[in-house]
């Protein structure tokens, strides 16, 4: 039987390995977009308005005695940037959705969202496959999606 310190060390080592793999995948995504000349943006995490999608519940917080909502997606802010004349953009960010808790769900998770001007459906599909391919370590899986 293992003692508590041994279990803690095992958990720390597992989490450290997961963190390293996650960091590498995010780095690969950033490298891909940099090669494609896509600008990384950073939009606000809070808003005075909740999301209008009836299937998504926003998380409300209080800031300076007023209600704010944590973003469920950076979509609205990113589309605002597009309307201001930004070109191709992407963002890797934390988003929040109430009632998304379960064995494989968390109310807080990381999302990647990107917009490409002048891409048709085929271009978007290829872009998505390229992003997936850059984070997959098994080459046999890459051949199946491209």
Annotated model-derived regions:
Residues 125-132:
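Short amphipathic C-terminal alpha-helix that caps PH/PH-like domains
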Residues 1-123:
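Class II aminoacyl-tRNA synthetase-like tRNA-binding/catalytic domains
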Residues 31, 133-134:
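Short, acidic/charged, Gly/Pro-enriched secondary-structure junctions
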């Amino acid at each position: 039987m293992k003692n508590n310190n041994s279990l803690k060390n095992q958990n720390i080592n597992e989490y450290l390995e997961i963190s390293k793999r996650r960091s590498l995948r995010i780095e690969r995504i950033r490298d891909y977009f940099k090669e494609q000349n896509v600008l990384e943006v950073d939009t606000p995490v809070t808003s005075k308005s909740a999301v209008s999608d009836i299937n998504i519940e926003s998380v409300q917080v209080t800031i300076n005695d007023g209600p704010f909502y944590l973003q469920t997606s950076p979509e609205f802010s990113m589309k605002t940037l597009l309307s201001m004349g930004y070109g191709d953009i992407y963002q890797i960010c934390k988003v929040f959705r109430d009632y998304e808790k379960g064995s494989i769900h968390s109310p807080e998770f990381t999302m990647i969202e990107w917009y490409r001007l002048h891409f048709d459906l085929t271009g978007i599909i290829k872009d998505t496959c390229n992003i997936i391919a850059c984070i997959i370590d098994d080459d046999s899986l890459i051949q199946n999606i491209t």
